[in-house]
Structure formats: C-alpha cells, structure tokens
Regions:
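Expand to "…catalyze enediolate/carbanion chemistry for C-C bond making/breaking, isomerization
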Residues: 24-324
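Bacterial N-terminal signal peptides
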Residues: 11-20
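Generic short N-terminal amphipathic or hydrophobic helices
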Residues: 3, 21-23
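Bacterial N-terminal signal peptides that target proteins for export
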Residues: 1-12
Length: 324
C-alpha cells in the first residue's frame, strides 16, 4: 500500500473509532431523567438548542438523523411553520429509532413552538386542543407565544396538565389540569415508559420536581412586557424569552439585527424580562454566539440557540462533564 493509501486508511480508522466511542458512551451513560434539558438545568448547566423558525423537516428519516444532534434539545417550530402533527409524530418516532442520543437519553428533548398566542385566557382555552395533539406525540415541552397575560399563562399550564397532579393548584389562581388521558399510549412509547409512569412524569417542572415537561413563555411584545412581573409568577413555567424580533416590531423599532437589540427601548425591555426571570427563578432564554456565550452565561442566560462551536465554548466554560 502506498503512502496516500495508508493515510486514507488511517483517517477512516480514526473516524470509525470516533463513531464507536460515541456509541459506547451513549450506551453506557445512565441518564437521571427522561428530559435532558431539565436534567442539565437541575445541575446548574446552561442548555443549548438547535432549530429555526423556518421549521423542522417532519419525517421519520429526519428524526433518525437528528437523534445524534450536538444540541441539548431540539426546538421544533410550528408557530410560523405548518402545524403538521402527523409530521411531528413521524419525527418523534424517528428520534426514538435513532437513539439513544449522545448523552445516553432515549431521545433528545424536543420543545415545540405551538401556534397559540397567549393574548388572554379565552384564546388559550379555545386552542388548547393543539397542546393535546402535540403532547400526544411524545415531545418534552411546549412554548406559549405572545404570552401577554397571566390568565393566558394559567390557562396554558392548565391545558397541559393531567388533573391527577395538584402541585401549585390554587396558588396565584392556578386551576386544576384539564389534559385528557387519550394520547398517553403514543407518548409513553416515545418516552420508553409505561402509560402509568408517563401520566406521573408528564407534568411541568420545576412546579413538580419529578416532572419531565419543560414549559416556556415568550414575553415578546409590549403587552407582555407591561405584565411580565405578574406573568412570570404563574406556577408551572420553567423558562422565558424576550423575543427580540417581535419585541422590536411591537416597540416600533425598525432597525434589524444588532442595531435593533442595541436600541435603548430594546435594552430596557430585555433587562425587564431578565429581572423578572431572576425574581421568579425562571430560566432566561437568549441567543448565544461564540463571541458572547461566556458573557451571557455570566449575566444569567441559561437557555439559547447555539451552533456546535458556541455550545462547545459554553460547555467548556461551565466545566460540563461528558457525555454531550
């Protein structure tokens, strides 16, 4: 064999060794929870997600591929992308078939942006069927968009909870859950648990310390901003974002990108949402980049979209132990 051939063989062997190593680590890792995003947050580790507002390809094949993502969770957009529950169901089946993921979890966590605007409780109640259908596919969390009003957020938490759970009921007017039992069988299959175990675990964390659902709200317009202190007091919410794109439009800021974020009105809006998150022990979501991820973490950002490079920098800074 000539020199070039030997070099090619060495490269191939190195790649195969890496694949085998990842597989062995995933198989030997023993996750503490079903939802890796929650597991990491309980350990004080920031979490990094992948996904875009253009949507995720809702197919079994894409799910198999994404099962080995670098990210801590997958943001699956159905707010602006089509509301295709069948596609989401096939995607979740693919994730389960392609797992375990790199951290040893059965699947990466999936959190869905559902096209329900939280303008008021009536709007959320009228569209609660969307949460039922999405959760039945076995996802691990849901984001409520334009969460403007505390009544809307209470209705959101109500819609995703089974009535067998009572943590927080009556606190700040939180009602009993209204989620129905049908759909449990399909979700339990994705999680790899019995139907009874799914019913016990499919509850919002950290309201329920043993819950495996991560709920988030988007405080992304001037109406939400006016109510943000009360909004984030509602029990059951785990994370919140300030949605700079929609916030800029709502505040009349016509600049784009960094120029918009640096506008004084935007700086004040972000600071208000961050302060409300800290006051209510809710994790703040903000975009990360390779240049600012360390500073963001120091500021208190615990959730955000990130490239593989950015996630690697953040994980190194916080001394996150492998596998990931």
């Amino acid at each position: 064999m000539n020199r070039i051939g030997k070099q090619a063989l060495f490269v191939l062997a190195t790649v195969l060794l890496g694949v085998v190593t990842i597989t062995i680590v995933a198989q030997t890792a023993k996750p503490k929870r079903i939802n890796q995003a929650i597991e990491l947050l309980t350990e004080g580790q920031p979490i990094y997600y992948t996904g875009s507002h253009s949507g995720t390809t809702g197919t079994y094949e894409q799910g198999v591929k994404d099962a080995q993502t670098y990210a801590d969770y997958i943001s699956y957009d159905m707010e602006h992308a089509p509301f295709d529950v069948k596609g989401l169901q096939e995607y979740m089946r693919g994730l389960a078939a392609g797992g375990p993921d790199r951290s040893g979890h059965r699947t990466p966590a999936v959190i869905v942006n559902v096209p329900v605007n939280g303008m008021d409780a009536a709007a959320v109640h009228a569209n609660a069927w969307m949460f039922n259908q999405v959760l039945a596919t076995g996802v691990h969390g849901v984001m409520l968009t334009h969460a403007d009003d505390p009544g809307a957020i209470r209705a959101f938490v109500e819609a995703v909870r089974f009535p067998i759970h009572h943590e927080g009921v009556g606190v700040d007017g939180l009602p009993e859950g209204r989620r129905g039992v049908h759909g449990v069988a399909t979700a339990a299959q994705i999680w790899g648990v019995s139907q009874e175990e799914y019913e016990e675990k499919a509850d919002p964390w950290p309201l329920n310390p043993n819950g495996e659902l991560l709920l988030g709200v988007k405080e992304e317009d001037k109406y939400a901003l006016a109510n943000v202190d009360e909004n984030l007091k509602v029990p059951g919410i785990g994370m919140a974002e300030w949605g700079p794109g929609d916030m800029a439009m709502s505040l009349g800021v016509r600049a784009q990108g960094a120029a918009a974020v640096q506008d004084p009105k935007m700086v004040a809006a972000r600071a208000k949402v961050l302060a409300a998150c800290k006051a209510n022990h809710i994790f703040f979501l903000n975009s990360f980049s390779a240049k600012d991820v360390v500073d963001m973490i120091k500021e208190g950002v615990m959730v955000g979209p990130a490239s593989p490079e950015t996630a690697a920098i953040g994980r190194k800074y916080t001394n996150r132990p492998p596998p990931f």
